[in-house]
Amino acid sequence: VSVQIVFVHGIRTSATMWRSQLEYLEEQGIPATAVDLPGHGTRMSEDFTVHEAMHTIDAAVRAAAAHGPVLLVGHSMGGLLALAYVGGAQRPQVAGLIAASCTSLPRGAGLAAYRAIARAVDRLPDRGMWITKRILEATIPEETRSDFAAGGYALDTQDTALGNLATLDLATAVARIRVPLWFVNGQWDQLRVNEPLFRRLAPHAELIVVPRTTHLFTAMRPQIFNAVLRLAVATIEAAQTTGTAAGPIPPEEWE
């Protein structure tokens, strides 16, 4: 029985951000799928809500779990949603979780400042596309540079999605998680701000910091992220073999 991987993209982008990883996993013979969240990619015309985003993740996980243990992988907003999902009141069929570029609680002054900057950029004549293209050209290798934009940018969804993220009780969710968990951040990622808190909430989790990379490290250094995927797959396979796989804390054990 092979480990099944489900990818959840970040804000503004879509499932296409994972093209490099999907290609690599196909070569390795590891089944994988990448979802489009509401308001993004092929679902650009839909309204974004946390409820529908969670339903999307749950449907993909359930479908994958019919074929083997599931490794859930989320980046940025996708990572936050994945943490909330795995640490939620239900016990999803997830055997391991990679939470990339998301060790930050989306609330308070930090979230307000981020939304203000995003709104200011969105008011530019080209809605900030010139800036986005220059940043990608300066930081992302040519072979993965187009992956973030290939499914379109969800500019009309961004502010709504950010506001919705503030409703997540991430501190409670992260503390409940008992499956193998990896926090993976770029060295210069602005969302490392609450990294120490996340490590305290999930002391069993592994922290991997990718040197000389930013928030978009999955595309900056895809080979390193592929190595993290291999590590997670091997860990889940070993746990399945020895029968040591863990799950989220059941409700009766919550403090």
What are these regions (language model features)?
Residues Q190-P196:
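Conserved alpha/beta-hydrolase "acid-adjacent" motif
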Residues A84-P125:
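Flexible "cap/lid" loop of the alpha/beta hydrolase fold
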